[in-house]
C-alpha cells in the first residue's frame, strides 16, 4: 500500500522549504513519520531478505579491494525544497566521508547493519577558505555500529555530524531526506574528505569562542577513488502522487 510513502512525502512537502525545515517542530513531524518506515513501504522486501541469508563477515570484501561492491541509489523525489532517496549497500561497501553544506539531513536505516563515522567542523564559520584543499580541524561526533531498527538520525548544517561516512556490515539500506538538496547552482556541492597525512598538525586547538577542543581530526578535501561508483537504479516501490 502506498499509504506510508505518500504520507511521508506530504509531510515533507508541508514541512521543508528551499531554505530547509520551516521550523524544528516541522522537522519533528517528518522525523516521526520516517521512524515508522519498513522495507515493504518502499518496495525493498526482497532486498531486506538478503540480511537473513547473509553468511557472515568471512565473505566481506576489504574496502581497499580493487573492485568495491556496487552501491545502488534509488531516487524517489527531488525539488528545490528537499530530496528523498535510498542507498542500498552490499556488505563491505563504503560511502566515503562527505559533507552536506547548508543542509539538514534525516537518515533512517531501513534494514541491515552499518558502521557510521561522523564529524563536525571545529570552526564551522571558516567554510570559505582561501585554499579549499587545505586541512581543517574537525571534531568526532559519532563512531558506532548501527542495526535496524534504530532511531532516525538528524544532521544539521553545523552540528550533529554533518560530515559522515558509511561502511556496510551486512546488506543494508539507508533512507535519506535532504533539505534543501545538493545544488551546484546554489553552491551546495558534495565534497569528499579524508584524514590529512600531515604529521605536524596539532591534536588540540582553541577555537574562536575560547573553547579548547582535544583529539582533533584534520580533514582535507580529496577526490574519491575511481572504483567508488554509485549506480542510479529505478525506484519500484509504491507510487508517490505529487
From Swiss-Prot:
Q: Which GO terms describe its biological process?
A: cellular response to hypoxia; detection of hypoxia; peptidyl-cysteine oxidation
Cross-referenced SUPFAM superfamilies: RmlC-like cupins
Oxidoreductase found in the keyword field: yes
- Keyword Chaperone part of the UniProt annotation: no
**Which positions bind Fe cation?**
98, 100, 164
Q: Which Pfam families match?
A: PCO_ADO
Q: Which GO terms describe its molecular function?
A: cysteine dioxygenase activity; iron ion binding
Consequence when changing residue 176 to A: Strongly reduces catalytic activity
Q: How is the cofactor bound?
A: Binds 1 Fe(2+) cation per subunit.
Superkingdom classification of source = Eukaryota
Q: Which UniProt keywords apply?
A: Cytoplasm, Iron, Metal-binding, Nucleus, Oxidoreductase
As cofactor, the record names: Fe(2+)
The entry assigns this protein to a family as follows: Belongs to the cysteine dioxygenase family.
What name does the UniProt record give this protein? Plant cysteine oxidase 5
This protein's encoding gene: PCO5
Amino acid at each position: 500500500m502506498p499509504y506510508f510513502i505518500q504520507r511521508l512525502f506530504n509531510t515533507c512537502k508541508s514541512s521543508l522549504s528551499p531554505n530547509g525545515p520551516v521550523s524544528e517542530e516541522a522537522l519533528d513531524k517528518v522525523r516521526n513519520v520516517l521512524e515508522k518506515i519498513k522495507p515493504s513501504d518502499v518496495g525493498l522486501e526482497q532486498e531486506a531478505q538478503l540480511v537473513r541469508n547473509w553468511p557472515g563477515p568471512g565473505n566481506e570484501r576489504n574496502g581497499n579491494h580493487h573492485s568495491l561492491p556496487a552501491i545502488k541509489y534509488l531516487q524517489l523525489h527531488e525539488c528545490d525544497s528537499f530530496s528523498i532517496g535510498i542507498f542500498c549497500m552490499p556488505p563491505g561497501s563504503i560511502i566515503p566521508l562527505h559533507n552536506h553544506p547548508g543542509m539538514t539531513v534525516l537518515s533512517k536505516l531501513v534494514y541491515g547493519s552499518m558502521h557510521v563515522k561522523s564529524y563536525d567542523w571545529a570552526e564551522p564559520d571558516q567554510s570559505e577558505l582561501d585554499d579549499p584543499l587545505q586541512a581543517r580541524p574537525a571534531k568526532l561526533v559519532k563512531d558506532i555500529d548501527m542495526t535496524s531498527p534504530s532511531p532516525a538520525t538528524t544532521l544539521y548544517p553545523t552540528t550533529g555530524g554533518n560530515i559522515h561516512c558509511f561502511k556496510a556490515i551486512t546488506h543494508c539500506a539507508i533512507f535519506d531526506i535532504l533539505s534543501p538538496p545538493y545544488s551546484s547552482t546554489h553552491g551546495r556541492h558534495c565534497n569528499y574528505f579524508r584524514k590529512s597525512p600531515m604529521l605536524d598538525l596539532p591534536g588540540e586547538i582553541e577555537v574562536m569562542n575560547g573553547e579548547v577542543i582535544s583529539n582533533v581530526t584534520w580533514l582535507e578535501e580529496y577526490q574519491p577513488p575511481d572504483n567508488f561508483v554509485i549506480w542510479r537504479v529505478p525506484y519500484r516501490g509504491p507510487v508517490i502522487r505529487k
